[in-house]
Amino acid sequence: MNTQVKLFLIQLLFDKKITFFPDINNQKFWNNLVKISSSQIIIPTVYFKLNERGLLKKIPNDLKDYLFEIYSFNKKRNQSMVNEINSIHKILNDNNINFFFLKGSYLLRTIYKNSIGIRMMHE
């Protein structure tokens, strides 16, 4: 079962053709998906990709609600970080201080700027 879940996640996250889509009532599969996604800190990304690929209607409603709740919370938290980063950016620029952002701070302002909810940050 875990092999199927891992294959599903790889295909989902890397925009590959999904060769196996579990039945909506396959509770064991969906529970394992949550466990693996949680352990890899990718639950918001899983929600985002399911939504992006139009697959949310094919998963259990309680799972959809759970994934959305985590995605939404993460998006709000990341937006708060972006606001703080922008404030720091302005202060440093106003004082002619050379700087650059690293890690999550950089990623939020560049790579993830149009979808800030997909990556969990811990900086």
Where do the PLM segments sit?
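Helical scaffold of the NTase/Pol beta-like nucleotidyltransferase catalytic core
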Residues: N2-I10, F14, I18-K103
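Short secondary-structure boundary/hinge segments and terminal tails
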Residues: L55, T110-I111
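Short, solvent-exposed loop/turn segments at secondary-structure junctions
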Residues: Y106-L108
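Catalytic metal-binding acidic patch
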Residues: K113-E123
